[in-house]
């Protein structure tokens, strides 16, 4: 590390240890249109019809494995629950702006809690066959006024490895639908232009239980807990996280300003609240729950994921609250972070302290105005009114029901 960078970091470190408690209690409203969008109330701007499906598509999966409720893909479950009691729900499909199919394609977990996406395409096809056979609404647009929550690693490509996900592409039957997904990366086959990118699920009540007094100084400069190498799937570290996590470890494992480890302590949430910067590098996918945790706990997210599309980017000013570091620049991470002026850091912290910012990243029970549920509805409302071109002529078809891998065509 350069001497200048080291001295700058130490000065920052000491400054924040002494003064961050006083500064962090201040908040700053998001300026301009972004702040207005974040605080929009979607009620009255759209009506959603929720299809009633057999429980094998949703509730029975959850009964079989309740772990799905706490998994980072749980948005598919909580969005269903939210819509059932939301004032935007209509029981008259003829007046609906949007149609929602409540299925839980990621609620199929291994004994270690990892999702198995391999049955998801068949489940999705089965549900679409069901709604297209029993209601007329799918057939009139072939899904263009329907939305699906697909929170898996690579969304509706339904594979956890990027190479395989790219090979598969988005499920053909979803080509016209709006996808609500955690995956977001520019110019990627698994992100449709009209998709709504959302945060992964992080348990609000669990995080709430770990809040510490706001006057505790932020005495950690850079914080990260997680894998640097996926020893089972990529022991050399060149493919996992495109080598970015391995580069963090190799360059900064002995740097006293970097509190990084594979250990996951019981004080993880408390530690994030004591840190100035929290690393949010890509893993197998560009996103992770660390992004949510950093925002909720007021730790400036350091986003290391080239071309990432972040949640609710039209409402949350990510450039103002976070720090973006190119994957190739990871070896310069210490210099980059220690070069950020103090006043810039303080402003980012004030923005992060805004309650509306935190609410937008969470799926609380019960729902709250401005939370992630409402941001999704805002995204759907901004797509209205639908263009007349989405409606097909009698007998017209746009989708190929026989396209896709042979395994996907088997009954579910």
Swiss-Prot record:
GO molecular function: 1,4-beta-D-xylan synthase activity; glucuronoxylan glucuronosyltransferase activity
Effect of loss of the gene: Moderate IRX phenotype. Slight reduction of secondary wall thickness and xylan content in cell wall. Specific loss of the GlcUA side chain in xylans. Slightly short inflorescence and reduced fertility.
Predominant subcellular localization, coarse grouping: Golgi
InterPro entries in the record: Exostosin (IPR004263), Exostosin_GT47 (IPR040911)
Assigned EC number: 2.4.2.-
Membrane topology term: Single-pass type II membrane protein
Subcellular localization: Golgi apparatus membrane
Transmembrane segments: 1-21
Glycosylation sites: 139, 400
Signal peptide range: none
Record topology, Lumenal segments: 22-412
Keyword terms, alphabetized: Cell wall biogenesis/degradation, Glycoprotein, Glycosyltransferase, Golgi apparatus, Membrane, Signal-anchor, Transferase, Transmembrane, Transmembrane helix
Assigned GO CC terms: Golgi membrane
GO biological process: cell wall organization; glucuronoxylan biosynthetic process; plant-type secondary cell wall biogenesis; protein glycosylation
Expressed in which tissues: Limited to xylem cells. Expressed in the root tip, xylem cells of roots, and in the vasculature of roots, cotyledons and leaves.
Membership in a protein family: Belongs to the glycosyltransferase 47 family.
Biological role stated in the UniProt entry: Involved in the synthesis of the hemicellulose glucuronoxylan, a major component of secondary cell walls. Probably involved in the elongation of glucuronoxylan xylosyl backbone, especially in the formation of GlcUA side chain of xylans.
Protein name (record): Probable beta-1,4-xylosyltransferase IRX10
Organism the protein comes from: Arabidopsis thaliana (Mouse-ear cress)
């Amino acid at each position: 590390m350069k001497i200048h960078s080291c001295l700058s970091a130490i000065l920052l470190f000491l400054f924040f240890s002494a003064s961050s408690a006083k500064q962090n209690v201040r908040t700053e409203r998001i300026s301009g249109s972004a702040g207005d969008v974040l605080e929009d109330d979607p009620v009255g701007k759209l009506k959603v019809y929720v299809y009633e499906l057999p429980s094998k598509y949703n509730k029975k999966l959850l009964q079989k494995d309740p772990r799905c409720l706490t998994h980072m893909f749980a948005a598919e479950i909580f969005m269903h629950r939210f819509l059932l009691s939301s004032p935007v729900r209509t029981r008259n499909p003829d007046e609906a702006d949007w149609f929602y199919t409540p299925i839980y394609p990621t609620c199929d977990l291994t004994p270690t809690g990892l999702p198995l996406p391999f049955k998801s395409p068949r489940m999705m096809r089965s549900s679409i066959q069901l709604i297209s056979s029993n209601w007329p609404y799918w057939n009139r647009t072939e899904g263009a006024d329907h939305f699906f929550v697909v929170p898996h690693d690579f969304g509706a490509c339904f594979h956890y490895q990027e190479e395989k996900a790219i090979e598969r592409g988005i499920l053909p039957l979803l080509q016209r639908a709006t996808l609500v997904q955690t995956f977001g990366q520019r110019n990627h086959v698994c992100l449709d232009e009209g998709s709504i990118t959302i945060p992964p699920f992080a348990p609000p009540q669990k995080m709430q239980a770990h809040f510490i007094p706001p006057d505790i100084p932020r005495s950690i400069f850079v914080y990260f807990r997680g894998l640097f190498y996926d020893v089972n799937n990529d022991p050399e570290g060149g493919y996992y996280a495109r080598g970015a996590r391995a580069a963090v470890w190799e360059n900064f494992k002995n740097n006293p300003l970097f509190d990084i480890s594979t250990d996951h302590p019981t004080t993880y949430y408390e530690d994030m609240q004591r840190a100035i910067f929290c690393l949010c590098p890509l893993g197998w996918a560009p996103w992770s729950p660390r992004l949510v945790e950093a925002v909720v706990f007021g730790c400036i997210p350091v986003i290391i994921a080239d071309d990432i599309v972040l949640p609710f980017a039209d409402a949350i000013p990510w450039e103002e609250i976070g720090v973006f570091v190119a994957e190739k620049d990871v070896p310069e991470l210490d210099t980059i972070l220690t070069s950020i002026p103090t006043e810039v850091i303080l402003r980012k912290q004030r923005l992060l302290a805004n309650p509306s910012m935190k609410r937008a990243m969470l799926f609380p029970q019960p729902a709250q105005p401005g939370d992630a549920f409402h941001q999704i509805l805002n995204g759907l409302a901004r797509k209205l009114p639908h263009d007349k071109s989405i409606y097909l002529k009698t007998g017209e078809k746009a989708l190929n029901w026989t396209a896709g891998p042979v395994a996907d065509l088997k009954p579910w």
